[in-house]
Amino acid sequence: MDIFKKQESNVRSYSNNFPVVFRKAKGCWLETEQGERYLDFLAGAGSLNYGHNNPVLKQALLEYIEMDGITHGLDMHSEAKAGFLAALDNYILKPRKLDYKVQFTGPTGTNAVEAALKLAKKVKGRSSVVAFTNGFHGCTAGALAATGNQHHRQGNGSSLTNVTRIPFEGYAGVDGLALFETMLNDNSAGMDKPAAVLLETVQGEGGLNAASNEWLQRLSKICKANDILLIVDDIQAGCGRTGTFFSFEPSGIEPDIVTLSKSIGGYGLPMAVVLLKPELDQWKPGEHNGTFRGNNHAFITAAKALEIYWSNDDFETHIKQCSQNVSEVIDRCVRRFPQMFVQKKGRGMMIGIECIHGDLAAEIAKACFDDGMVIETAGPDDEVVKFFCPLTISESELNQGLSIFERAVETIAAKHFKQAS
């Protein structure tokens, strides 16, 4: 551990909560240098929806490397890229009757958000955007300006501008969309007409706040009526995490731009894309570029993941069942321990439980880790315990993790509160 304390920057965060050295991983399990095993209910913050070292994806990648397939090719054509584009079209876009062009950005989610914002401003000729309270979109300047969290924003060191923040659904009891519409139609409101609205349908780092279908439909209607582009940040909520491939599918809306990263690469390899309606593809060649636009190794595993998990409804059915199992445990804990918990948050397997304060959530997460499970928190006060296991988890493994969580809750309840029956 000394090497990390000596040489790695203080900016590290997850490792502070899990002070062990991991050596290998498979499925939903992590293993330390000493051979201790931990259930992974963090899954790379949603980057490992198909699990660690998924054997089918690993085999496809090994075969590609063995035949000396292209590793790095800037944005040149490659068989790997063609395979991914075909898989995305065949298994995701066509079945949902979605017509998007694909832009490969730098390999992180914030790269995709920056590109989406830049394109929206270019197309509309406007400099401002609208974002929402408790939203998180990345830590580079443009994405950070649209992020609500003070902890991340204050690390910038300079002003973060050209973003108007509107209350997300349920925030402080305010109808944010009514306010937004009023401000758009009031010349004295002080809000310049935005190029785009940027949102997460389920706010990951903001505390798993889930927008209703009706709210999303209202927002989409407002954007269309006012010639404003709608950008959905599906970096954490996409690729099945909320139960469908895109988080916005249940609402029936069709965003103008969608950003994807994290699990889009299938194997945990860096990859990010922007999906944009064809009429918005107004880039000039090389106008938005980068050395690592498109990871050919990730193309291989991404295409295989789409083929294996999204060619029929079996995977969605499995996610739905997992979500029901987790929901039952959360609902039971909320009923049994009202002095500890407020409510269930999120949807699908982007789900969690809101504690009465962040210290309690941290204590639960630590107790889980001490009992062999990695689990994290989210929210303004880190008050929400997030259940973010790989979506490929088996029922027995899921139940094992839920048992660890319930044991932690019961231990802490006995320590601090009079236990409910």
Swiss-Prot record:
<comment type="similarity">
    <text>Belongs to the class-III pyridoxal-phosphate-dependent aminotransferase family.</text>
</comment>
<keyword id="KW-0032">Aminotransferase</keyword>
<keyword id="KW-0663">Pyridoxal phosphate</keyword>
<dbReference type="GO" id="GO:0045303">
    <property type="term" value="F:diaminobutyrate-2-oxoglutarate transaminase activity"/>
</dbReference>
<keyword id="KW-0808">Transferase</keyword>
<dbReference type="GO" id="GO:0019491">
    <property type="term" value="P:ectoine biosynthetic process"/>
</dbReference>
<dbReference type="InterPro" id="IPR004637">
    <property type="entry name" value="Dat"/>
</dbReference>
<feature type="modified residue" description="N6-(pyridoxal phosphate)lysine">
    <location>
        <position position="262"/>
    </location>
</feature>
<dbReference type="GO" id="GO:0030170">
    <property type="term" value="F:pyridoxal phosphate binding"/>
</dbReference>
<dbReference type="InterPro" id="IPR005814">
    <property type="entry name" value="Aminotrans_3"/>
</dbReference>
<dbReference type="GO" id="GO:0047307">
    <property type="term" value="F:diaminobutyrate-pyruvate transaminase activity"/>
</dbReference>
<dbReference type="InterPro" id="IPR015424">
    <property type="entry name" value="PyrdxlP-dep_Trfase"/>
</dbReference>
<dbReference type="Pfam" id="PF00202">
    <property type="entry name" value="Aminotran_3"/>
</dbReference>
<dbReference type="InterPro" id="IPR015422">
    <property type="entry name" value="PyrdxlP-dep_Trfase_small"/>
</dbReference>
<comment type="pathway">
    <text>Amine and polyamine biosynthesis; ectoine biosynthesis; L-ectoine from L-aspartate 4-semialdehyde: step 1/3.</text>
</comment>
<dbReference type="InterPro" id="IPR049704">
    <property type="entry name" value="Aminotrans_3_PPA_site"/>
</dbReference>
<dbReference type="InterPro" id="IPR012773">
    <property type="entry name" value="Ectoine_EctB"/>
</dbReference>
<protein>
    <recommendedName>
        <fullName>Diaminobutyrate--2-oxoglutarate transaminase</fullName>
        <ecNumber>2.6.1.76</ecNumber>
    </recommendedName>
</protein>
<dbReference type="InterPro" id="IPR015421">
    <property type="entry name" value="PyrdxlP-dep_Trfase_major"/>
</dbReference>
